[in-house]
């Protein structure tokens, strides 16, 4: 049912574990649900120690709310876990408590279970699809949305996509850090001595 939906390709072999090497992602939104597709190089839920797929969702497209990761403020988190059998063991949606620090991972709290499936008619699949009720993540079509996807194993290996928006534009980690720095430094331009606190040091040479 994802046929005809435009997806985004991710780099192959950027993780040493093919089970968590994300190679393709997709998103589609209708009036009721937001659905995600995640494909990996090899079947993801086949390791005995378990595999976790997480999606950080900036539901209001505002970096100043939610958990901060360069490029987004994650208001919601999806966590899908599976092991050995090739099937999903658990799939949970979390919200973020904005009274907590923006770098506090424990600020996420559980909201509800969600639908997720990693199997196909032919057996174990290299893809999972999941679906979230729009009401649960408070989507406003006028605000847009950004997200990123991670896949990790218990050995510490991880693959992370770029930040992606609904127009399928991608924002790399380095670009997002640079943009954030420019915004911050714009408030620290030197008025008297000509020194700008911007991380560039050429103005000290004059």
What is each stretch, according to the model?
Residues 1, 56-83, 123-125, 134-205:
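Acidic/polar low-complexity flexible segments
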Residues 1-13, 46-124:
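Extracellular/luminal beta-rich ligand-recognition
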Residues 2, 11-24, 34, 204:
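A broad structural signal for short, well-ordered beta-strand segments within beta-sheet-rich domains
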Residues 15-16, 43-49, 136-141:
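A short beta-turn/strand-edge loop motif at beta-sheet boundaries
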Residues 23-27, 114-120, 185:
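Beta-strand-rich interaction surfaces with strong enrichment in secreted/lumenal proteins
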Residues 29-35, 48-50:
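Extended extracellular/luminal ectodomain segments enriched in beta-structured repeat modules
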Residues 32-42, 55, 126-134, 199:
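Short, well-ordered beta-strand segments enriched in hydrophobic/aromatic residues
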């Amino acid at each position: 049912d994802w046929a005809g939906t435009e997806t985004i390709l991710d780099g192959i072999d950027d993780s040493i574990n093919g089970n968590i090497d994300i190679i393709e992602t997709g998103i589609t939104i209708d009036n009721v649900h937001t659905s995600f597709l995640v494909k990996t190089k090899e079947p993801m839920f086949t390791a005995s120690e378990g595999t976790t797929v997480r999606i950080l969702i900036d539901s209001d497209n505002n970096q100043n709310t939610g958990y901060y990761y360069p490029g987004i403020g994650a208001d919601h988190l999806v966590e899908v876990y599976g092991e050995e059998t090739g099937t999903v063991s658990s799939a949970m949606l979390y919200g973020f408590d904005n009274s907590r620090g923006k770098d506090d991972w424990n600020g996420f709290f559980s909201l509800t279970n969600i639908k997720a499936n990693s199997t196909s008619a032919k057996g174990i699949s290299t893809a999972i699809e999941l679906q979230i009720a729009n009401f649960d993540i408070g989507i406003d079509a006028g605000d847009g949305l950004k997200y990123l996807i991670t896949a990790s194993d218990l050995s510490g290996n991880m693959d992370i996509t770029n930040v992606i928006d609904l127009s399928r534009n991608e924002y790399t980690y380095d670009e997002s850090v640079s943009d954030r720095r420019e915004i911050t430094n714009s408030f620290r331009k030197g008025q008297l001595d000509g020194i700008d606190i911007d991380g560039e040091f050429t103005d000290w040479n004059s």
